[in-house]
């Protein structure tokens, strides 16, 4: 166990004793803290790289757009923590770098975003085996995913480049994670 795991265990044990948590609740609290710690670590790595490459704001805009839609639309996850790092760097560092260094035609980005809105309308919310969505929430999540995506798209029509393109990129990335091709392997297990 590393230093952070020990601290998480100590804090989870403290919470268990203080709040009379049973063993299952203790495990849930500990898992939640472990996931939070890993995600914070990934964000620190990703945003540090973005800062070094002088694209911090663009990475932030892309990532926030992605997150605002994803909290309602859900979507595919990387199979491991390592692949999550790799995918995050590709999607939120390399793709914004491509947009910064190679002017992507405004019309192409609009077309890709409109296609992405269609994908979100059809496939959101996309549950996974590890993160199922309760049936009672599906309609509401679909509605919010569409509303948030459309609102962000309308904002891109009002604001100037390059910021509009990074919002569009976030919409496109989230739409890709909803495609059924990412769930075939999971369904076969």
Curated annotation (Swiss-Prot):
GO terms for biological process: proteolysis; quorum sensing. InterPro entries: AgrB. The keyword Transmembrane applies. GO terms for molecular function: peptidase activity. It holds the Pfam family AgrB. It is found in: Cell membrane. It is a multi-pass membrane protein. Belongs to the AgrB family. HAMAP family: AgrB. This is Accessory gene regulator protein B. It comes from Staphylococcus aureus (strain NCTC 8325 / PS 47). The lineage of its organism: Bacteria, Bacillati, Bacillota, Bacilli, Bacillales.
């Amino acid at each position: 166990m590393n230093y952070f795991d020990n601290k998480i265990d100590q804090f989870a044990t403290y919470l268990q004793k203080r709040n009379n948590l049973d063993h299952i609740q203790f495990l849930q609290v500990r898992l939640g803290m472990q996931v939070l710690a890993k995600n914070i670590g990934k964000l620190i790595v990703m945003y540090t790289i973005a800062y070094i490459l002088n694209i911090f704001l663009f990475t932030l805009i892309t990532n926030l757009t992605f997150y605002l839609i994803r909290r309602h639309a859900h979507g595919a996850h990387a199979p491991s923590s390592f692949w999550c790092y790799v995918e995050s760097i590709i999607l939120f560092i390399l793709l914004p770098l491509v947009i910064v260094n190679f002017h992507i035609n405004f019309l192409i980005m609009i077309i890709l975003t409109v296609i992405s809105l269609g994908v979100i309308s059809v496939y959101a919310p996309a549950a996974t085996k590890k993160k199922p969505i309760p049936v009672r929430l599906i309609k509401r999540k679909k509605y919010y995913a569409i509303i948030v995506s459309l609102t962000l798209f309308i904002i891109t029509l009002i604001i100037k480049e390059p910021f509009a393109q990074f919002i569009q990129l976030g919409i496109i990335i989230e739409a890709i994670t909803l495609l059924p091709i990412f769930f075939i392997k999971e369904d076969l297990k």
